[in-house]
Structures are given as structure tokens and as C-alpha cells.
């Protein structure tokens, strides 16, 4: 559909010429409908079109082609049938073009060099780069790391809202939630007690489900917690398939940071102490010997 080519009427020999014509036509169409960056038109499209190699389509198996078609190719959604503006080789060259927009010298030669790596499958960029390079939203990073502080503003803005925008453009999320006070922690502003991190992680989980990655795959996120946090046991239950669904996060992964001191205590069969993070504010930023010293001080 991207090439407007018929194997019976047009023959295999004409395939390269159809690629060249479709390449220029569909780049212009992508810019026209607001899917592609207009700076792509500044390239020497004739030179890039001559570099296209339709025989490299044979590098794909059926599953690879179908995945590319379903998730990665630029779609013209202004048409009734949601026509693809790309085939595999137009896809590779578009990604290559998007990665050299800021280059000033020998851009086309560099694009062709990168395209050659892509088409031969000797190299492949991450999914966000393949989704977004050359588009109006050229977010190319795969993953974002963040830390949530112990206040409602940080939790709701950094931990939920900002992550939604990052997930929207296919960014994976990994965040530290240790600083958020655990269950039973005193809240001075309301004279109440904290419900811990679990309800907020449930919000983050639902945000990953609600704001998927450009409509092409589900959101991806992982929450990290240190071993001394007093909500650790509830945290370790989050991925279970049974129990209260309000305290389960099926869309979000979890990870537990384990310090050397914990393993030393385990080996020696000694006690391990849990803390509410607001009561041990320095602990989260320490590691190694400094962590061990401060942890033991807090235990006293």
C-alpha cells in the first residue's frame, strides 16, 4: 500500500523505481499531515532514494514483517483505511534521516551509511527511536530514571503526571519510591498518618495502563524500594495475582535494592530493622560503608 505497486502488473524489476517514487511522495505526505518533520524535505531525496535496496526486505521473516507493519510504520490516519506511508526500506531510511537532522556536513552520506547497517540487521536502534525519529515528536530515549520525594506534590507531579507524558512517547520508566514515608508515618500538616506507598504505586500502575506508548504498546515502568523501608512486605506482594486488587500492580514491575549489610546480617542470622523513611532522612542517599554506619546509628 505504501508503494502503490502490483507484482503482476508492474514486475519485480520495477520495484526499486517504485521505492524511489514512493519515498519522495510519502515523505511529502507525512509532512503534509503533520506526522513527519518538515526538515526531512531539506535532504537530497533523489540521492537517498537511489540508495534504497528492496532486496533487503528478504532479511525479515513473516513475524518480523507483521510486527513492523502493526507497530512501527508511519500511518496516514486521515484516510479511511489508515494507509501505511512506509514499507521496510522506507522505514529504515526515515529513521536514519531523523537521526541526522542536526548534522551540517555530508548528511546524506552518513544517512546512507546508517541505513546500510539497519537494512542488513547489523545494528538496530531502540523502539522509541524507531517510533519517533523524523517525526514531530522526536523523543528517542528508551528509559527515564526519576526519584519521588516525600511530599504530595512530588508524588502526584513527578511520580504520576510527568511520567504520563514520558510514557506517551514510548519512554520506559524506572523510579525510586523509598523517600515516600511508609505506613503509619506522621503527617504534620493534617495531624494524620500516612497510608504508605502502596496506594500511590497503584495510581502509577493505572497511569501506565491508561497512557500507553503512542497507542503501539503498553506503558512500561518499574518502582524501586530499599530493603529497610517499612512497607517492604506489602511492596513484595504487589505483583501477586491474588489478594486485594487495590493493592496490586499488574502493569508495573517492582525491584528491591538490597545493600551488602542485609546480606551480612542474613548470613550471620542477625536481626534486620525497618524504618519509616521520614524518620531516617539521610539513609536513602547513602551507600557502602557510610550507609552501614548510619543504619547502625539509627538502630540505636
Where are these regions (language model features)?
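Extended catalytic cores of very large enzyme megasubunits
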Residues: 1-300
Amino acid at each position: 500500500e505504501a508503494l502503490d505497486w502490483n507484482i503482476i502488473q508492474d514486475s519485480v524489476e520495477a520495484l526499486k523505481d517504485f521505492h524511489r517514487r514512493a519515498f519522495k511522495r510519502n515523505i511529502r505526505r507525512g509532512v503534509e499531515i503533520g506526522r513527519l518533520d518538515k526538515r526531512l524535505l531539506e535532504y537530497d531525496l533523489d540521492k537517498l532514494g537511489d540508495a534504497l535496496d528492496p532486496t533487503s526486505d528478504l532479511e525479515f521473516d513473516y513475524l518480523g514483517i507483521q510486527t513492523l507493519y502493526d507497530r512501527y510504520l508511519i500511518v496516514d490516519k486521515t484516510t479511511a483505511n489508515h494507509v501505511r506511508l512506509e514499507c521496510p526500506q522506507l522505514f529504515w531510511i526515515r529513521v536514519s534521516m531523523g537521526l541526522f537532522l542536526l548534522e551540517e556536513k555530508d548528511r546524506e552520506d552518513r544517512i546512507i551509511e546508517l541505513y546500510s547497517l539497519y537494512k542488513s540487521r547489523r545494528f538496530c536502534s531502540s523502539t522509541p527511536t524507531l517510533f519517533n525519529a523524523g517525526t514531530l515528536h522526536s523523543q528517542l530515549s528508551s528509559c527515564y530514571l526519576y526519584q519521588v520525594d516525600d511530599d504530595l506534590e512530588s508524588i502526584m507531579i513527578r511520580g504520576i503526571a510527568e511520567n504520563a507524558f514520558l510514557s506517551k512517547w514510548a519512554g520506559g520508566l524506572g523510579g525510586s519510591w523509598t523517600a515516600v514515608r511508609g505506613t503509619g508515618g506522621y503527617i504534620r500538616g493534617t495531624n494524620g498518618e500516612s497510608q504508605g506507598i502502596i496506594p500511590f504505586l497503584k495510581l502509577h500502575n493505572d497511569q501506565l495502563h491508561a497512557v500507553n506508548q503512542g497507542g503501539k504498546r503498553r506503558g512500561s515502568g518499574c518502582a524501586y524500594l530499599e530493603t529497610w523501608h517499612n512497607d517492604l512486605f506489602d511492596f513484595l506482594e504487589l505483583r501477586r495475582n491474588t489478594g486485594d486488587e487495590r493493592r496490586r500492580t499488574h502493569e508495573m514491575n517492582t525491584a528491591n535494592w538490597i545493600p551488602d549489610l542485609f546480606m551480612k546480617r542474613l548470613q550471620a542470622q542477625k536481626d534486620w530493622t525497618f524504618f519509616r523513611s521520614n524518620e531516617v532522612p539521610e539513609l536513602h542517599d547513602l551507600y557502602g560503608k557510610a550507609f552501614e554506619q548510619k543504619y547502625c546509628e539509627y538502630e540505636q
